[in-house]
Each structure stands twice: as structure tokens, then as C-alpha cells.
Amino acid sequence: MTETFAFQAEINQLMSLIINTFYSNKEIFLRELISNASDACDKIRYQSLTDPSVLGESPRLCIRVVPDKENKTLTVEDNGIGMTKADLVNNLGTIARSGTKAFMEALEAGGDMSMIGQFGVGFYSAYLVADRVTVTSKNNSDESYVWESSACGTFTITSTPESDMKRGTRITLHLKEDQMEYLEPRRLKELIKKHSEFIGYDIELMVEKTTEKEVTDEDEEDTKKADEDEEPKVEEVREGDEGEKKKTKKVKEVTKEYEVQNKHKPLWTRDPKDVTKEEYAAFYKAISNDWEDPRATKHFSVEGQLEFRSIMFVPKRAPFDMFEPNKKRNNIKLYVRRVFIMDNCEDLCPDWLGFVKGVVDSEDLPLNISRENLQQNKILKVIRKNIVKKCLEMFDEVAENKEDYKQFYEQFGKNIKLGIHQDTANRKKLMEFVRFYSSESGEEMTTLKDYVTRMKAGQKSIYYITGDSKKKLESSPFIEQAKRRGLEVLFMTEPIDEYVMQQVKDFEDKKFACLTKEGVHFEESEEEKQQREEEKAACEKLCKTMKEVLGDKVEKVIVSECLSTSPCILVTSEFGWSAHMEQIMRNQALRDSSMAQYMMSKKTMELNPRHPIIKELRRRVDADENDKAVKDLVFLLFDTSLLTSGFQLEDPTGYAERINRMIKLGLSLDEEEEVVAAEATVAETAPAEVTAGTSSMEQVD
């Protein structure tokens, strides 16, 4: 008997909206139907925990997808709990779900159709690709029924007691003419892998398998039999007939069979103690497309008011485009109750952890989670906080093996430093993970904690210097005094170090002191302090004269506390850019010129009063401050200091000319005579060229 029902008004409106709206991402229908099938299997499984008999003759729960090209149908079938007649009427037509209206409002407001299942009305996504849907369902407490509708305002329900269905639901989609791609096994495999790979039940796809089979050539046999009938019967038992072999041929045989598509089971639902290293490696490769095993793994679950499970992996190598600004990040896959939601959830993980790969499966996130409301979702913020915490624990575990951490840091050290720059809450912890070369560490890198343990008695600051390379910094004039006093200096050789040190002021109550900036002081004895004051007084006139010569090129000229063997250096203000930072910013294509002008403050020139050059210069100034040679020497010292301090020469040509003059003086050459000689040569050769040219012209004539 068939009964006809009218759709509830809102359901009718929803179906009309789905059918008449052009929507490109129609593939989500399969995800929704498989998700519903999984829920149905969950329900019967829960019942079987208290009453195993409910599983009856089909204890193995699974989901089947059957494409039928001949009839242009696609069927999604499960042996879950099934639906009674009342369920079919209520769930698929007359009683609007609470999410129906909310989904339509979201859709009309520009929301994504892929959110349909997240409002509890995912079944209706079938009408994105089908113009007619048939649902056959059987519940243990009722006979089987068939629900059918073409989305024309009504649906029918027919009793089918003769059906062979034992239990479950079979949804058959009669596909639209332009949706035949969903009958192709390749396309179906792609969608199942993308959206439903970690559903807890086997998803079996009906596929065609072609095999070659060797069979007797019937045509040859028939011909042979006819020939034998014509021959005399006495020859039927000739020798050799017994050994004659039948001719065979190979034919292709097409069979249909079910093939499990989701072989990678959701490892995160298992106890970490029961998962092997090989299983983690296989799972990592499946979700990341990496060919190498992960360097580190963190499998954890959070329970209580919030419940989610996760597995995080650290790859062995950093991707070549890790810091590309427009790169689409799809490292953390978000699942809600094992249903895939999205793979580029940027709010699930901070930028600096962009190299970590893994999955998060939440039991509490609402299924109506969308990109628009992710940022405001409190549950997601808690998940993010826990992910960061567990990643830090994972890095701690890697750091237990020195060689492993060295390789990890080579690949992801920049990410750790980016975290220090961005993540205020975890900055203190992240500082424990950074490594630097130092004046005492040789070819090995040192931690800040180890540096602090090696600090001299009375040392109050952590001394560091920034630059292009370790080799350059080892011979930098800025570290001379520190080395003379036996103080260790950290070498920061990456551009990101400049940004890190703008955010970090101390470590374990020890202030950071940049040796390339003014205001650096070393612990001095009373005798050293007295000597310093005497040197300042002795160089006062020299400092004043040099400032007058250099003018606006420097802020001031003072006696240095950092130099030991070099004559002079240039330092920047405490809050301005260092020479290395200035170089970095000069290379920025889109730099802010006004900001650069402000931060590239005037430099301070520091003199080493004990250096022979400075002593002789001071003597000359004291004797005659108007000495012409002094001006040239001061500019030459300034330009040389620019180079040794890591700055860019403001006037390379002028510097070269001054160097050339110094060379000529050293060689006792007379510059004027050389120029005259050159001019004389030109004067002598010019007429000869003209004469030669004239004679050749005459020859042509």
C-alpha cells in the first residue's frame, strides 16, 4: 500500500532552494550520506552493547556505495539501525528539524552549501545531484518501507514486506543528466578519500574487476568434431589422438566486487599504547603525502568539559615554501566526530607552528562550524591552546636527544624564533628551545640556559651581536673588549634574530645587551674607571674636532668601552636599528621610507684611546687642530668604521679617492705630474690618429 504525504512548508522551501540554486561544490552530498550512514551504524552498535541480539544476521557493520551506470543511479547503503515508517515520515518530510530554518537563513546570508549537514538536514543535499531519491529502510521493530520523492512538494511511503533487506537503510539517487561523473569509480574514490577516509566503519565501493581467463576455443572444437564425423570410424583410435591437446584462448572476464576505500582507520581513537611506530608512520604518510617517517609524534586526548583527540607530527624536513605568504596551509585536518570538516583551518594552529601536521577530532564542536564563525568559537580557542601546549611538550621530547634536536633545529629553528616574536603567552618557554653559536661554543650551538650557567661572577648581562655570518662576527671589533675580559658573546646570524630581540629583553632575569648599540658597560675596577676618566679627558679635544669635521654624519664622538685592538667603530642608539637590521630593511622592496628614516638614527663614533692611530691623531689635533691632513684621516676613519661596523658606505667614490691618495703618499707619487703626463699622451696621439685617418681616406679616393 502506498501513502502520499506533503512536505512540511519549511522542508519544501529548503528543497526548492537546493534544487534551484546553482552551487558548484555539489560533491558534499556523498559526505553527508556516508556521515548519516555512520550515525545509523553507531546507533545499532550502542544498542548491541546491552543487547547483542539486535545485530541479528549482520553483525559486521559497514557502508556500501554502488554506482549503476546502466540505470544511472548511485546507491549508499548501510546495515545500521534503520528507520521505522514513523521515522521516515518524521525525519524525511513532515517535521522540520530545528536546523532547517537556521540553515536557510545562513544560506540566504551567503553561507556555504557544504554546511548543510552541520544543521542536521544533510540528507537533502542528495537533491544537488539527483532529481529523484528513493529510500528503502528496515528497522528491527518494523517491516521495511520505501520512501520516494522527486522534490515536487510531496513524498510517498510504500510498505514492502517482501523486501530482502534484513536491517538498515538504502538510499538510491536517480542522477540528473549533468551529474553522471558521480558514477565513475575514480571520482567516488577521490570523494571518499577526501571527506570520509576516517569514518569508523568500512566504506565498500562496488567496482568492476577485469581478469583474463583461459578457456577452450569452442569454435575450433566444433570444427574438429565435424571433421571426425566424416572420417572412417576405424581411424578414431589412431595413435597420437590421445595426446592431442585442446586449443585454448584467453578471454577477459568482468566481475563486480566490493573494495574497501577507507583502509586507514582513525588511529586517534585508539590508545597510544596500542599503536606501533610503523602505524604512526603509515598514518602520517597518508595524511601528509610525505615519503619519510615523521621526526616526532604526539598522540593525545583531552577529556572533561571539552573532549577531543589529536595526533600531531613533526616532519623531518621543512617544505621549501614554508614561509610563502600566499601559501594555502592544510597541515591540520579538522574532524567533528570523525567526519572531515576542513583541512586548512588556520585558526586551529598559530602561524609559527605551520610545519606541524596532524588531525584533530572534536566531539564538542558544533557541526555548523564555518570559516566565518571559527574565530569566535570558544571551543576552538581551547583546542588551539591545547595543541600549542602539546607541541611544546613534543619539542621537549625531541630535545632529549641532542643529535635529533640539532637536525630538528636546522629545519625549524626559524619557526621557533617566529613563535617568540608572535606568541607572547609561550615566549618564555620558547626561549628554552632557541640555539645560537657563541664565542665559546666553537662549531656547536648553545642554549641560553647553558650560557647563563657559564656567566662570569658579577656578569649582569647576556652579551650578543647580530650579523650576516658567524665568521664575520668572530672577527668583529665589537666583541674585542668582551673577549679580552673572557666574556662569552652570542652570535645571532639570521635576519629573524633582529625581530626576536625586539620582543625579548631578558632571560632568567639577565638582561640582553647588544654590543653594536650604545650604552654597553662592563664591570670595571676602580683603577680601570679612573684610567677611563683620564682617557676621556685627554681625548676631549679630538672628539670635538672629529665631530666638527663629520658634522651630521654622526650624533657624537666618544671614548669607547668595547674596543681593544681596533681604532674606532660606529654604534647605533639603544632603541634604533642595528647595522644588520638596517641592511635587512634596505633590502625590503616595500619598506616604509618614513619609518626607515626614523629608525636609522644618527650613529655614535667610538674611539679606542689606546690605539696608535688615535694617539697620533690626538697629537696632531693638539698641535694644530687646523691640520689639513687631519680632515682626510677623519673621513677615512669614518668610512672604514662604516665597513667594519657592518654599515653601507654612503660615498664609495669618495672613499676610493681617499684610499688612492693614501696609497700615493705611501708610494711617494706626485698626483699632479701623473695627470699632466696623461694629458700630454693624449695630445701627442690625437694628431697621429687624424693623420692616419686622412691618409686612408686619400687611398680610398
Curated annotation (Swiss-Prot):
Motif extent (TPR repeat-binding): 697-701
Record Pfam families: HATPase_c_3, HSP90
Residues binding ATP, per UniProt: N36, D78, F123, R371
Record's keyword annotation contains Chaperone: yes
GO CC terms in record: cytoplasm
Keyword line: ATP-binding, Chaperone, Cytoplasm, Nucleotide-binding, Stress response
MF-aspect GO terms: ATP binding; ATP hydrolysis activity; ATP-dependent protein folding chaperone; unfolded protein binding
Biased composition (Acidic residues): 228-242
Entry keyword annotation includes Nucleotide-binding: yes
Family: Belongs to the heat shock protein 90 family.
Subunit structure: Homodimer.
Domain comment quoted from the record: The TPR repeat-binding motif mediates interaction with TPR repeat-containing proteins.
The protein, known as: Heat shock protein 83-1
Organism the protein comes from: Leishmania infantum
